[in-house]
């Protein structure tokens, strides 16, 4: 803590990919001292030592700590003189707490916004370009929120590219503007850093130095804008340009040329992240002890029912121990009652345990409750889903096996009495085993399928144990690549491929003509399966499948409505894996039973959660598209670390019209069109409608394959962002891959932190959380 006789000082530290920055801020908001220093990994050093010393500097993290200690010492200060320290930056690691005492961590985006607003309080647009990524930040007055966009994994629009150019031309970045020929028309590649560097090598001995520098700086500016400039579309005003790349005034010149906006470079542009962290440290110090983390969804049970406690007593076999357990149960039952509505909370269970005299009985109770608390909040339906998935995907039977994609109506296959295998879901199940996944990717690569191919489809091409299909059905939309891969798989596994494969033509736009086209196609697909498999469709069974689908639909809508109108009841981390709209159980009794159990569990959860949480007390996020299946880290970080629960998931929207058992093909065609994924306009409208109904405060789109997936491409994202902005809902786009973790950009957690901090600022008036009442 700072000395009481002195004015308070606040420290902000920004640990980036190539530099470390620090700022000391006074109580009055004046910069007392700043530091901008290149970081160089220590030769042969470990990431972090295991000793007690925290500032010896003999490991990489320790070296960073020693840099801060030396920085403070240069102005005659130590950490004891600092009232509050906040850190930010892409290279902040978990071990940092052992080496540097700090009070809070904030995202780089929030830090840069705070830094810019410290000197430009009315600024509306900020562009930060550092060594590893570019960040655009824009204030939306209608939503009263700072929106942001970060570049992906390419280095072309970052300081790393300019460092490469500087080294090749032997010109310091700070001198490039002086040597730049701004009238030059020479162009180099702005597609990627590697191609750009290749162009520099090709041109440096063939053109004047000023022309080459101009080409490199223009390419840099263009790549920055192609990566994050979408956020500034239709914006006309000043842009605060900060970060290390702002040392190069030539890049600023070309940014102004491209955007038509005035570019302002602050005095402290290289340390604006650290400055913002120091500004936030001053605010955090003033709120210390007054704020608490926002409420989020519980991931585990908070208590056990009295009947469950009775089960514990009944399980005790030793007569003496049983008498003691029964005595304790009677005392509890007198206070709580014996019905299933009363519960023992975890603290109450601890008190009960203290009343037990037998150590053995204490251990037995502890083991019993641990098992209960480790269960998910919707335990029975989760177990049913697991069992049904295992049966559907891994059981063997005499019935013909039909491969299907996510969109072909499962009711038809249920009525035909065949076994079905949804190939995309089968691939997703592989995601939990990275070793097995790697083997699939390796084998697919040997067949010529590179990373440009969807990872779901690469898994299928590379899986040498893919169950043999007797027939395959797919749809032409929304994934044409999937249709072609399915056809290739059939050719590779079936001698008479043409008679064992059917593509249902699915027009992107709805209307009666599209419905008729799909209905006729469904009839053709049934005829093709009848011929190939030697089976016959029973119209009564198809009508029954429609009736069962309607029953499950009605229950699913009730489940949705409960979640729409309640505080977050279950973690989105778990619920997104349900993917109800893609299930192959529609048309079966199992789906009805599953939805009935899930409904009962949700009603019980609702009663419990609403005792201590109001619907408006938490953030309410909508998760769009699929999650990363290889790890729950991303969604867990969002919901638990950042306290921003997912209230609902797009893949669980059930809202199509009832099926008509007397006209099954037409109604199934209508269902297929109204699910939404075939037509972006229908999809976006449904998202908007459900978002309003569910009181959604923010949306997260997981951008599978970085926009190359047809269900989350750049045009869809642009349309979605504009549409959600109209109704005041901010959108976070997380680039990544649902199965291939090697392409996961290191900026994912930063984006999540920045998004939730902006939501906190809008909801609570500060980024840290609600003020205690």
What is each model feature region?
Residues 114, 159-163, 267-301:
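Glycine-rich phosphate-binding/hydrolytic loop that grips phosphoryl groups
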Residues 196-230, 270, 683:
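Adenine-nucleotide phosphate-binding core of ATP-dependent small-molecule kinases
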Residues 89-92, 232-258, 269-273:
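Glycine-rich phosphate-binding loops at beta-strand->alpha-helix junctions
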Residues 102-109, 256-275, 728-735:
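Conserved phosphate-binding/catalytic loops in two-lobed NTP-binding clefts
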Residues 39-55, 145-182, 279-283:
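Glycine-rich phosphate-binding loop plus the immediately following alpha-helix
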Residues 394, 406-407, 412-439, 622-688, ...:
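Redox- and metal-dependent alpha/beta enzyme cores, enriched for Fe-S-associated oxidoreductases
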Residues 315-400, 519, 523, 527-656:
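A charged, amphipathic alpha-helical module
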Residues 10-62, 145-148, 152-153:
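Short glycine-rich, Thr/Ser-proximal phosphate-binding strand/loop in the N-terminal lobe
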């Amino acid at each position: 803590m700072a000395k009481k006789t002195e004015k308070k000082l606040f420290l902000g530290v920004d640990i980036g990919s190539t530099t470390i920055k620090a700022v000391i801020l006074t109580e009055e908001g004046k910069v007392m001292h700043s530091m901008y220093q290149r970081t160089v990994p220590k030769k042969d050093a470990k990431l972090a030592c295991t000793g007690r010393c925290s500032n010896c500097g003999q490991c990489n993290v320790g070296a960073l700590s020693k840099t801060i200690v030396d920085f403070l010492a240069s102005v005659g200060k130590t950490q004891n003189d600092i009232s509050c320290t906040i850190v930010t930056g892409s290279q902040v690691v978990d071990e940092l707490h052992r080496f540097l005492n700090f009070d809070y961590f904030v995202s780089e985006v929030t830090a840069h916004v705070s830094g810019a607003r410290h000197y430009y309080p009315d600024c509306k647009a900020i562009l930060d370009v550092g060594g590893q990524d570019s960040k655009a930040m824009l204030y939306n007055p209608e939503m009263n929120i700072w929106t942001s966009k970060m570049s992906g994994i390419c280095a072309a629009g970052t300081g790393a590219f300019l460092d490469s150019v500087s080294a090749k031309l032997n010109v310091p970045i700070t001198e490039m503007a002086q040597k730049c020929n701004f009238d030059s028309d020479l162009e180099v590649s702005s597609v990627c850093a590697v191609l750009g560097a290749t162009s520099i090598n090709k041109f440096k001995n063939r053109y004047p130095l000023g022309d080459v520098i101009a080409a490199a700086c223009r390419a840099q500016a263009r790549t920055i804008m192609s990566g994050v400039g979408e956020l500034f579309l239709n914006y006309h005003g000043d842009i605060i340009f900060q970060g290390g790349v702002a040392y190069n005034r030539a890049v600023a010149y070309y940014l102004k040329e491209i955007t038509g906006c005035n570019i302002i470079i602050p005095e402290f542009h290289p340390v604006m992240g650290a400055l913002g962290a120091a500004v936030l440290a001053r605010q955090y110090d003033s709120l210390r002890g007054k704020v608490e983390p926002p409420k989020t969804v519980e991931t585990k049970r908070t208590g056990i029912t009295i009947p469950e406690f009775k089960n514990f007593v009944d399980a005790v076999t030793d007569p003496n121990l049983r008498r003691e357990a029964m005595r304790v149960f009677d005392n509890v039952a007198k206070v709580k009652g014996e019905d299933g509505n009363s519960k023992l909370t975890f603290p109450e269970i601890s008190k009960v345990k203290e009343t037990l005299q037998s150590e053995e009985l204490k251990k037995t109770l502890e083991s019993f409750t641990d098992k209960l608390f480790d269960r998910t909040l919707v335990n029975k339906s989760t177990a049913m889903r697991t069992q049904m998935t295992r049966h559907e995907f891994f059981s063997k039977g005499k019935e013909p096996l039909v491969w299907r994609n996510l969109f072909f109506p499962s009711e038809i296959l249920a009525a035909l009495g065949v076994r079905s295998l949804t190939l995309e879901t089968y691939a997703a199940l592989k995601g939990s085993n990275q070793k097995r996944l790697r083997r699939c990717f390796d084998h697919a690569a040997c067949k010529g399928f590179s990373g440009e191919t969807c990872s779901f489809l690469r898994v299928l091409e590379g899986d040498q144990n893919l169950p043999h299909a007797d027939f395959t059905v797919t749809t032409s939309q929304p994934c044409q690549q999937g249709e072609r891969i399915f056809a290739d798989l059939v050719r590779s596994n079936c001698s008479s491929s043409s008679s064992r494969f059917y593509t249902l033509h699915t027009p992107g736009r709805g209307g009666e003509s599209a419905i008729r086209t799909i209905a006729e196609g469904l009839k053709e697909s049934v005829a093709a399966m009848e011929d190939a498999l030697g089976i016959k469709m029973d119209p009564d069974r198809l009508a029954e499948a429609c009736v069962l689908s309607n029953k499950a639909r009605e229950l699913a809508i009730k489940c949705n409505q409960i979640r729409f109108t309640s505080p977050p009841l279950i973690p989105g981390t778990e619920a997104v894996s349900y993917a109800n709209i893609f299930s192959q159980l529609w048309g079966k009794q199992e789906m009805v039973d599953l939805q009935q159990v899930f409904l009962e569990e949700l009603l019980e959860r609702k009663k419990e959660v609403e005792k201590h949480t109001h619907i408006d007390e938490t953030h309410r996020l909508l998760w769009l598209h699929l999650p990363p299946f290889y790890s729950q880290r991303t969604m867990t970080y969002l919901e638990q670390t950042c306290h921003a629960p997912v209230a609902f998931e797009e893949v669980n929207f059930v809202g199509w019209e009832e099926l008509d058992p007397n006209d099954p093909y037409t109604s199934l065609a209508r269902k297929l069109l109204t699910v939404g994924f075939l037509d972006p306009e229908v999809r976006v409208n449904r998202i908007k409608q459900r978002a309003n109904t569910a009181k959604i405060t923010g949306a997260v789109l997981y951008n599978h394959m970085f926009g190359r997936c047809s269900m989350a491409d750049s045009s869809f994202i642009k349309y979605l962002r504009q549409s959600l902005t109209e109704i005041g809902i901010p959108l976070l786009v997380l680039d990544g891959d649902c199965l291939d973790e090697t392409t996961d950009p290191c900026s994912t957690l930063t984006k999540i932190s920045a998004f939730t901090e902006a939501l906190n600022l809008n909801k609570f008036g500060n980024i840290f959380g609600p003020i205690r009442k």
